[in-house]
Amino acid sequence: MVGIIVKDGESIESALKRFKRDCANAGIMSEIKRREYFEKPSIKKKKAIESAKRKAEKKKRLFSKKDKA
């Protein structure tokens, strides 16, 4: 849970900015968007497999460029 303590003499705008930054760093908004709708386990698995394939292809391209140089 993200929380901040407003310092003496601190404006509301700067406290709100710190709170939003802490929320972004904690990944709260991305988690809310991910959980907005129910996702079947089969769809989750399919997305994970696709993500792994993309990462492997990216890694393969990265290392093939290093070998050529």
UniProtKB/Swiss-Prot annotation:
GO molecular function: structural constituent of ribosome
GO terms of biological process kind: translation
GO CC terms: ribonucleoprotein complex; ribosome
Annotated region described as Disordered, given as residue ranges: 49-69
Keywords: Ribonucleoprotein, Ribosomal protein
Superkingdom, natural source: Bacteria
Matching InterPro entries: Ribosomal_bS21, Ribosomal_bS21_sf
UniProt keyword Ribonucleoprotein, yes or no: yes
PANTHER family per record: MITOCHONDRIAL 28S RIBOSOMAL PROTEIN S21 (PTHR21109), SMALL RIBOSOMAL SUBUNIT PROTEIN BS21 (PTHR21109:SF22)
NCBIfam families, alphabetized: S21p
Family: Belongs to the bacterial ribosomal protein bS21 family.
Name the record gives this protein: Small ribosomal subunit protein bS21
